[in-house]
């Protein structure tokens, strides 16, 4: 299956998940009180960390390896299952201590219930990896959509019946249970019970998986350090403003890069020895991501003040100033976040781990320096740290696929030129539009957005041959 087909089905699944998230926000928030949501948020701190270490990078190893036998898959299955059981037992044993730390007695029962998702999801991680390895993303999308929709309907029903936080707990359990059953049904592979572990096979993937697990842990802590430092040294209102800006920045970027990297990984892994195919596929992927991200984030930065005030209210004004720096940061991160896929496909998770350590040192230094001044300076330093981190990461990435930074910059330069022209046009028309509509009205915001989007679209048709060919050929999204 091609990258386009992979991305198409991953995107459909992701859109449904986002829709389910919106239902959670809009409808469940009306039925479940904030205090109950808070309990689930506490539980998710533990659950998300558990999910991070659940498979120790072994599922990625199944996808990455050019040739893999059933013995290694079987060993990975049993290792994951025991890891899932181990994490669940740890959560059960430590739930009173976790509850005491958060000063929330109800958290004990929530953690006891939700811990079941670890053995459930672990028992199907090998099956999911095999489906992804074979690019069966249409089947995966069908499974994830079905599980998401059924899960949210059950949550709505339970919330209506005043189950409170347990509506969210059961939504999570139902999603994992249904996904597990369907992944088992979709994959023909079955575990063997006579010899659970082939230690020679596990030894083969140990280096790949260990480095990937360490990178994931480093990345998890470095990405959450900013909120911890701001919360420790600045006012809670400042942390709130920063968190909102960060979520606004991250929401579209996370969705785009998740779709791209999940669809890209099996394709790159199969072509890991064909450097020309690898380079072309990766550069095309980066081009597609930046084609959307550059105008989106540039426009958001330019219109941050009216956008924030109109959508969130005047009390969030500080968020608009932070967005001026986090929006361009998102452009850099949208490229950096794809780099892990290439290093994984090439089996060089050792380089990925070292880059993770470098990134953590840069980000932590930026956070520690920035917090001494103001939240705006904090955001500026974060932006500069991303720029510094970009060059060694992309230099090493292009090097292992027999390319160079010049090829990367040459590929994406037209997009940045188009984005710059779009901002210049928006700057020129801003005053005339402001004379027609007040800056803090939806009429002004929508008009400016339309002008920016139209400018960018026209430039894309004129300057970019692939976009022109795509439109002229009228390639459907779903074929």
Residue ranges and their predicted role:
Residues 398-405, 426-479:
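Membrane-proximal transmembrane or re-entrant/amphipathic helices at the cytosolic face
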Residues 108-115, 143-189, 204-208, 244, ...:
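Hydrophobic alpha-helical transmembrane segments
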Residues 3, 138, 181-224, 228, ...:
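Interhelical loop/hinge segments that connect adjacent transmembrane helices in multipass membrane
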Residues 78-103, 109-112, 153-157, 161, ...:
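Alpha-helical transmembrane segments of multi-pass membrane transport and lipid-handling proteins
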Residues 1-22, 60-63, 67-75, 107-108, ...:
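N-terminal membrane topogenesis motif
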Residues 2-58, 82-95, 112, 117, ...:
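Signature of the first transmembrane helix
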Residues 51-70, 132-133, 245, 249-293, ...:
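Helix-loop junctions and terminal segments of transmembrane helices
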Residues 3-4, 61-70, 120-144, 166, ...:
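Membrane-interface junctions at transmembrane-helix termini in multi-pass inner-membrane proteins
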């Amino acid at each position: 299956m091609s990258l386009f087909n992979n991305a198409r089905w991953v995107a459909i699944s992701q859109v449904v998940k986002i829709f389910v998230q919106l239902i959670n926000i809009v409808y469940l928030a009306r039925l479940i009180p904030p205090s109950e949501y808070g309990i689930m948020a506490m539980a998710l701190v533990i659950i998300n960390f558990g999910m991070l270490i659940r498979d120790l990078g072994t599922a990625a190893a199944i996808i990455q390896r050019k040739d893999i036998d059933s013995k290694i898959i079987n060993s990975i299955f049993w290792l994951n299952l025991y890891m899932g059981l181990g994490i669940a037992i740890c959560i059960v044993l430590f739930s009173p201590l976790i509850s005491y730390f958060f000063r929330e007695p109800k958290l004990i029962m929530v953690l006891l219930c939700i811990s079941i998702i670890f053995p459930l999801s672990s028992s199907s991680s090998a099956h999911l990896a095999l489906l992804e390895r074979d690019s069966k993303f249409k089947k995966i999308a069908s499974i994830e959509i079905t599980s998401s929709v059924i899960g949210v309907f059950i949550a709505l029903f339970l919330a209506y019946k005043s189950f409170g936080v347990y509506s969210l707990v059961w939504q999570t359990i139902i999603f994992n249970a249904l996904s597990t059953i369907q992944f088992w049904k979709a994959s023909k592979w079955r575990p063997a019970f006579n010899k659970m572990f082939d230690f020679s096979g596990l030894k083969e993937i140990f280096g790949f998986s260990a480095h990937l697990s360490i990178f994931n842990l480093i990345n998890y802590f470095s990405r959450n350090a900013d909120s911890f430092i701001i919360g420790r040294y600045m006012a809670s209102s400042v942390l709130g403003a920063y968190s909102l800006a960060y979520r606004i920045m991250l929401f579209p970027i996370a969705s785009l890069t998740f779709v791209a990297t999940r669809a890209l990984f099996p394709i790159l892994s199969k072509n890991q020895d064909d450097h020309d195919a690898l380079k072309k596929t990766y550069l095309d992927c980066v081009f597609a991501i930046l084609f959307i991200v550059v105008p989106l984030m540039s426009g958001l930065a330019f219109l941050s003040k009216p956008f924030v005030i109109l959508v969130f209210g005047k009390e969030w004004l500080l968020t608009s100033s932070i967005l001026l720096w986090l929006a361009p940061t998102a452009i850099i991160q949208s490229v950096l976040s794809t780099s892990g896929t290439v290093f994984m496909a090439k089996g060089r998770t050792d380089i990925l781990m070292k880059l993770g350590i470098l990134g953590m040192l840069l980000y932590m230094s930026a956070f520690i320096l920035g917090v001494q001044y103001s939240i705006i300076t904090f955001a500026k330093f974060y932006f500069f740290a991303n720029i510094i981190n970009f060059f060694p990461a992309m230099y090493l990435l292009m090097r292992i696929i027999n390319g160079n930074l010049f090829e990367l910059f040459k590929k994406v330069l037209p997009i940045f030129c188009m984005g710059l022209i779009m901002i210049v046009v928006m700057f020129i028309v801003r005053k005339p539009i402001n004379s027609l509509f007040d800056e803090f009205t939806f009429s002004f915001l929508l008009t400016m957005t339309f002008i920016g989007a139209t400018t960018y679209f026209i430039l894309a048709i004129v300057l970019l041959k692939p976009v022109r060919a795509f439109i002229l050929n009228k390639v459907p999204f779903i074929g």
